[in-house]
Amino acid sequence: MSSKKILVADDEAHILHVVSMKLRNAGFEVITAVDGEEALELCMAEKPDLLITDFQMPLMTGLELCTRLRGQEATRDIPAIMLTARGFDIEPEEMEAARISAVLAKPFSPREVLQKVNELLAPAGAKAGAEQA
């Protein structure tokens, strides 16, 4: 697998560690942030291939982070996975406006995260072939 870059943003050290290790072990390059402001700065500087962000973080929520990224040409197309214990509190309109690709409710397994990452980063042809199978 080519080394795709993933930014993982979560203020819970345990979740940040577990998700990062699972992704690194799968061959991804991982950068991490512990709050929304740091995640925004890293997204602008690093242009990751995918963002995994917690919904509830200090300084800026994951939803606000995604919304702000969509307003910048350089980051508007980065797919985003939202991690949340409050998945049902996010309004569908907010998710659509922030262009959140997927939501994973806590608790989740690292395998679920890796599966969703692979789905979102799969080449378009691979996705079409998988849907036809």
Where are these regions (language model features)?
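Receiver (REC) domain active-site loop signature in two-component systems and cognate sites
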Residues: 57
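Active-site T/S-Asp motif of two-component receiver
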Residues: 52-54
